[in-house]
């Protein structure tokens, strides 16, 4: 039984045991493009990946399943070398603690996503990045593009082109790196991890 066959079983909930860790060769491989029209298996896998992210962000389900909270997941992280990513970025509460009008600033499963253009300006998260496949802290600025235009297909086989900036752009670039065999710490300057290039946007 392949990893995907196990993951898409109706009763299976993706948990931390399904997520492979650094050192596994799947994380360093360039993943294969999915074929269209999408197979039921690839659609279900995308839905399961999104379900995992929602569970991971839910305090009750997250604790029950022992999950680390995540805003993105790529198929290679669950040992399926396909170009599928799921992104779920929640909107914050307002200053008075009220829930946002829209729960998420981005909620999408992207098939065969690719960056088709990007800004000259770079950006990095002030606190660095983490990864569900990396069980250690690696400090430093992860240098990425401040703005990107991404093309992808959705589960209905429809093509989209979206422009992203800020945190959403960072998250999508992190996940696209996964399908290209790249891990976030590859983009940290090992000798000067917190060196900010001139004009680089630091996102708090």
UniProtKB/Swiss-Prot annotation:
Keywords: Hydrolase, Iron, Metal-binding, Protein biosynthesis. Fe cation binds at residues 131, 174, 178. The keyword NAD does not apply. Its EC number is 3.5.1.88. Binds 1 Fe(2+) ion. GO terms for molecular function: metal ion binding; peptide deformylase activity. The keyword Iron applies. Removes the formyl group from the N-terminal Met of newly synthesized proteins. Requires at least a dipeptide for an efficient rate of reaction. N-terminal L-methionine is a prerequisite for activity but the enzyme has broad specificity at other positions. Belongs to the polypeptide deformylase family. HAMAP family: Pep_deformylase (MF_00163). This is Peptide deformylase. Disulfide bonds: none annotated. It comes from Streptococcus equi subsp. zooepidemicus (strain H70). GO terms for biological process: co-translational protein modification; translation. Its cofactor is Fe(2+).
